[in-house]
């Protein structure tokens, strides 16, 4: 059996929330989280494959620091995303662990395994062409793995968010 390529260090933890602003306030007040940076009022993901079918969806997204870890808050703005599915089925909570990977295709194949685990999302970010995917391996782990392609574009895009943890 060939060992899968080792994932790099954790990039962020993603939480699905009902209200991005309220979640930021609560995390700041209860846990000293922050500062937070918003990705805007609406991030619209176009031409994304969700469960293998083309769709689009919108989210409100904010990044912040919590105990030295970068966190992502995701508020679904419609019912077409895996985030909305998660919220309806499980309520607010930890949705995914994310990794920036230089060898996207190789890592995606390794994380999916054999037989391949469900590919919840396969797409690119809004207006930036950074490849990303959600893999749901199921089983006892119960948390989705997000892979984001490490590239000069993703480094420039995610740099300000990564700096939140260094403050």
Regions found by a protein language model. Give the residues of each.
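Residue-level detector of short, conserved catalytic/binding motifs and their immediate flanks
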Residues: 11, 62, 95
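Short glycine-enriched loop/turn motifs at secondary-structure junctions
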Residues: 6-9, 56, 90-93
């Amino acid at each position: 059996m060939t060992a899968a390529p080792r994932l790099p260090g954790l990039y962020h933890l993603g939480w699905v929330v009902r209200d991005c602003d309220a979640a930021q306030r609560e995390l700041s007040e209860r846990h000293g989280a922050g500062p937070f940076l918003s990705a805007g009022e609406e991030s619209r993901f176009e031409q994304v494959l969700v469960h293998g079918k083309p769709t689009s969806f919108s989210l409100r997204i904010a990044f912040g620091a919590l105990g030295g870890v970068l966190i992502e808050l995701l508020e679904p703005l419609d019912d077409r995303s895996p985030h909305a599915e998660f919220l309806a089925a499980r309520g607010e909570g930890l949705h995914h662990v994310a990794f920036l990977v230089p060898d996207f295709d190789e890592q995606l194949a390794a994380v999916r395994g054999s037989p391949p685990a469900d590919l919840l999302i396969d797409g690119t970010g809004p207006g930036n062409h950074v490849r990303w995917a959600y893999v749901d391996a199921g089983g006892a782990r119960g948390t989705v793995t997000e892979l984001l392609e490490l590239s000069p574009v993703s480094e420039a895009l995610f740099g300000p968010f990564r700096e939140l943890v260094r403050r």
